[in-house]
Amino acid sequence: MKPTFNPNNRKRKKVHGFRARMATKSGRRILAARRLKGRKALTV
């Protein structure tokens, strides 16, 4: 079986990055929730 985690920084940013989160309504909700919780890092 192939490993399930194949690190790829470009994909990582595209999927979980700040701009990707800001692009959708639900993504903005995620950021808001993480701000409320007081997360040190909002995104990867």
UniProtKB/Swiss-Prot annotation:
Similarity comment text for this entry: Belongs to the bacterial ribosomal protein bL34 family.
PANTHER family with a match to the protein in the record: LARGE RIBOSOMAL SUBUNIT PROTEIN BL34M, MITOCHONDRIAL RIBOSOMAL PROTEIN 34 FAMILY MEMBER
Gene3D superfamilies with a match to the protein in the record: 1.10.287.3980
Cellular component annotations (GO), alphabetically ordered: ribonucleoprotein complex; ribosome
Keyword Hydrolase annotated: no
HAMAP family: Ribosomal_bL34
GO molecular function, one term: structural constituent of ribosome
Protein name: Large ribosomal subunit protein bL34
Gene Ontology BP terms: translation
Keywords annotated in UniProt: Ribonucleoprotein, Ribosomal protein
